[in-house]
């Protein structure tokens, strides 16, 4: 009986370590485009036996815990949110905002004392003494800014509907969101190469990591624009980057050509020349639209492409990792969009804010690719 219990316990710990390292769910069962290579690299039996031989079970836990830098922060946030379960500040919804839809600095609103309690509980501001007037004070505005920044809201210190909606989400629901984010972090195959690029889609940021003896070292961080969350979301997958292309042509996907480019050209024939578009059919290239060549695009025997230049949708460079979804990283001429707080604006590809910095990170093994050469 004791031997049977020991075997079952050993098996249960191995399962726990495997789930901790790889995740409980195989992302491929959710139709996410992940390769399974990294899931085979972790052997829970070996890790557990080594820890037992050393008399240190914590060693196994450390070995199984994902090295993804954000994972530790997520675990800390999960513990904090779980500790707030049932907190009195969320016992009731906040009252409706006035017709203006927001509360500005110095204005009064009956819900502000509860807002202050929630922000203090979440660590975004210091606790406010009981009986404090229901006014949007400078201290409360700073707390709102901290909360808004953490939730990808416009950090303006104003209490608007989006901020109220976010504040009304109970800690228990937030804890579930964090737990799901931790599961996704376990899917991230950071140890597969000596350098990794990770796009945090809901955060609208890209990170570049170097892997040194199992340690994950952050090297690059920048804002990105990702796919529209409802219509053309950026899919989750992992692939190997194979090449970088400077001054690229943009081959307009047929879905965009049908829904946007061709209707625009039909309304305004001069649009094609102004934007640097041309129609390619076999060895023929035309810069003038006609019913015949536009129909050829629609039936798949021709394609629209955009010439390199200041108007090119891909900007100065694209970073390619072949995949069946035609998703890649690229620059953009519309750099002002990076100043937005919510940046789900693309058709699925990821637009990067600092293409030169990213190219340096990707091409660093080749000393001929200097910053000056890349910038040209």
What are these regions (language model features)?
Residues 11-15, 34, 38-42, 49-376:
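Well-ordered beta-sheet/strand-loop patches within structured domains
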Residues 4-22:
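Short, hydrophobic/amphipathic alpha-helical patches that form generic packing surfaces
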């Amino acid at each position: 009986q004791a031997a049977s219990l020991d075997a079952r316990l050993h098996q249960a710990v191995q399962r726990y370590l495997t789930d901790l390292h790889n995740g409980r769910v195989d992302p491929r069962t959710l139709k996410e485009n992940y390769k399974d290579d990294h899931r085979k690299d972790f052997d829970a039996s070996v890790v557990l036996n080594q820890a037992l031989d050393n008399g240190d079970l914590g060693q196994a836990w450390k070995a199984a815990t994902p090295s993804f830098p954000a994972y530790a922060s997520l675990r800390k946030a999960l513990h904090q949110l779980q500790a707030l379960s049932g907190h009195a500040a969320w016992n009731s919804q906040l009252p409706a905002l006035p017709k203006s839809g927001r509360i500005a600095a110095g204005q009064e609103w009956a819900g502000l004392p509860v807002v202050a309690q929630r922000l203090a509980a979440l660590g975004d501001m210091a606790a406010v003494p009981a009986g404090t007037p229901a006014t949007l004070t400078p201290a409360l505005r700073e707390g709102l800014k901290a909360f808004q920044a953490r939730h990808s809201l416009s950090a303006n210190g104003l209490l608007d509907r989006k901020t109220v909606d976010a504040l009304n989400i109970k800690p228990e629901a937030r804890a579930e969101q964090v737990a799901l984010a931790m599961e996704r972090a376990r899917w991230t195959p950071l140890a597969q190469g000596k350098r990794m690029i990770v796009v945090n889609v809901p955060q609208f940021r890209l990170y570049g990591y170097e892997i040194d003896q199992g340690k994950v070292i952050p090297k690059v961080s920048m804002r990105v624009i990702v796919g529209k969350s409802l219509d053309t979301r950026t899919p989750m997958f992992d692939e190997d980057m194979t090449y970088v292309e400077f001054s690229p042509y943009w081959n307009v996907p047929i879905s965009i050509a049908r829904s946007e480019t061709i209707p625009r050209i039909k309304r305004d024939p001069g649009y094609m020349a102004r934007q640097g578009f041309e129609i390619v059919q076999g060895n023929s290239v035309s810069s003038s639209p006609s019913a015949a060549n536009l129909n050829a695009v629609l039936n798949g025997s021709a394609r629209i492409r955009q010439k390199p230049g200041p108007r090119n949708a891909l900007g100065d460079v694209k970073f390619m990792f072949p995949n069946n979804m035609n998703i890649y990283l690229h620059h953009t001429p519309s750099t002002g969009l990076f100043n937005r707080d919510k940046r789900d604006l693309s058709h699925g590809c990821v637009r990067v804010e600092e293409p030169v910095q990213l190219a340096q990170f990707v091409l660093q093994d080749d000393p001929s690719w200097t910053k000056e050469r890349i910038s040209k």
